[in-house]
Amino acid sequence: MNLHEYQAKQLFARYGLPAPVGYACTTPREAEEAASKIGAGPWGVKCQVHAGGRGKAGGVKVVNSKEDIRAFAENWLGKRLVTYQTDANGQPVNQILVEAATDIAKELYLGAVVDRSSRRVVFMASTEGGVEIEKVAEETPHLIHKVALDPLTGPMPYQGRELAFKLGLEGKLVQQFTKIFMGLATIFLERDLALIEINPLVITKQGDLICLDGKLGADGNALFRQPDLREMRDQSQEDPREAQAAQWELNYVALDGNIGCMVNGAGLAMGTMDIVKLHGGEPANFLDVGGGATKERVTEAFKIILSDDKVKAVLVNIFGGIVRCDLIADGIIGAVAEVGVNVPVVVRLEGNNAELGAKKLADSGLNIIAAKGLTDAAQQVVAAVEGK
């Protein structure tokens, strides 16, 4: 679950980290009033969406008058911002952040993620701030410096100083950087985060460090113990189908293809998508109904898949272990009866109660294409899409 920049900076303030004074505004009038609270200009105005590349898309601007602030707010509030990280529809701009402009001398990068290979939280820092860190990692990886947090000791000040020296910082900037490093590490661990990015972390012309931007990603599986973060969720920034799936504890990710996939188990779901691609198809989604699937959840999963107008066929691939294949069959039958299906449905059932599930589907009178194996299922669903 991602947070908006203004929400990230609210957290920074709670942990004593330096960030510009700013206010999130939902109307042009609020934006003008925010400027008055901040004081004399110039001011930075930023569209609040869960996507990078806002500046290049016109969603970030430095202005010198309250009239310009009002014009920016009137232009963007209620509109959709399209960046290189969004689809063609963009994301809705419901708030803009008005904050004091910063005199920038140099831009740095500081971020943290969970490194799956080392199973530790890893901090990354670079002198190449203000640009996409992925591009830096690809073209000049030697400019990214890393330290891993020991799960027993947690973050240590010497690690912050080590990164500061590698960035070429001196004097009081080393102390300031170390404080920011320790604060971000504390936020990451205490708030069950999956991602922190300060891009850019800037050195001002006055010689101080300040978090000019902030991107936080929370671990969705840990939100039950982070009620305040859960309240910050902005579902308007999410794919409606993904939000609906989350309410039913379904793991759904929308993709750009035309073959809907319903699978139990994340590994099997990824393998199913791979084999569909191998045979010339394009998955429309990743959907894992999980190990504790019920008839109701399977019905909802089917409805979510069919709500995508791009879907021209559906592949159901179930390996019955914890999930019984006959329950999956009941869910498919229920979904078809409730929603109606105008696209081919290919079903592959293996394992626990597979024969009973297949019999239920056969006796239902529905137009279901039974597959004899995973390869056969992929070939049949691709052929169905192509009209063969």
Curated annotation (Swiss-Prot):
What organism does this protein naturally occur in?
Shigella dysenteriae serotype 1 (strain Sd197)
GO cellular component terms attached to this protein's record = cytosol; succinate-CoA ligase complex
Reactions catalysed, semicolon-separated, are: succinate + ATP + CoA = succinyl-CoA + ADP + phosphate; GTP + succinate + CoA = succinyl-CoA + GDP + phosphate
How the protein assembles, per its UniProt entry?
Answer: Heterotetramer of two alpha and two beta subunits.
Q: Name the EC number(s).
A: 6.2.1.5
Q: Does the keyword Aminoacyl-tRNA synthetase apply?
A: no
**Record-linked Pfam families:** ATP-grasp_2, Ligase_CoA
Keyword ATP-binding found? yes
Which family, according to the similarity comment? Answer: Belongs to the succinate/malate CoA ligase beta subunit family.
Q: Which residues bind Mg(2+)?
A: N199, D213
Q: Which cysteines are joined by disulfide bonds?
A: none
Q: In which pathway does it act?
A: Carbohydrate metabolism; tricarboxylic acid cycle; succinate from succinyl-CoA (ligase route): step 1/1
Give a short account of what the protein does: Succinyl-CoA synthetase functions in the citric acid cycle (TCA), coupling the hydrolysis of succinyl-CoA to the synthesis of either ATP or GTP and thus represents the only step of substrate-level phosphorylation in the TCA. The beta subunit provides nucleotide specificity of the enzyme and binds the substrate succinate, while the binding sites for coenzyme A and phosphate are found in the alpha subunit.
**Lineage per the UniProt record:** Bacteria, Pseudomonadati, Pseudomonadota, Gammaproteobacteria, Enterobacterales
Q: Can you supply a Gene Ontology BP term from the record?
A: succinyl-CoA metabolic process
CC cofactor note: Binds 1 Mg(2+) ion per subunit.
Q: Where do the ATP-grasp domain residues begin and end?
A: 9-244
**SUPFAM superfamilies according to UniProt:** Glutathione synthetase ATP-binding domain-like (SSF56059), Succinyl-CoA synthetase domains (SSF52210)
Stated name of the protein: Succinate--CoA ligase [ADP-forming] subunit beta
Q: Which Gene Ontology molecular function entries are recorded, alphabetically?
A: ATP binding; magnesium ion binding; succinate-CoA ligase (ADP-forming) activity; succinate-CoA ligase (GDP-forming) activity
Which InterPro entries does the annotation name? ATP-grasp, ATP-grasp_succ-CoA_synth-type, ATP_grasp_subdomain_1, Succ-CoA_synthase_bsu_CS, SUCC_ACL_C, Succ_CoA_ligase-like_bsu, Succinyl-CoA_synth-like
Q: Which UniProt keywords apply?
A: ATP-binding, Ligase, Magnesium, Metal-binding, Nucleotide-binding, Tricarboxylic acid cycle
Where ATP binds, per the record, is at: K46, G53, R54, G55, E99, T102, E107
Q: Which cofactor does it need?
A: Mg(2+)
- Where is substrate annotated to bind? N264, G321, I322, V323
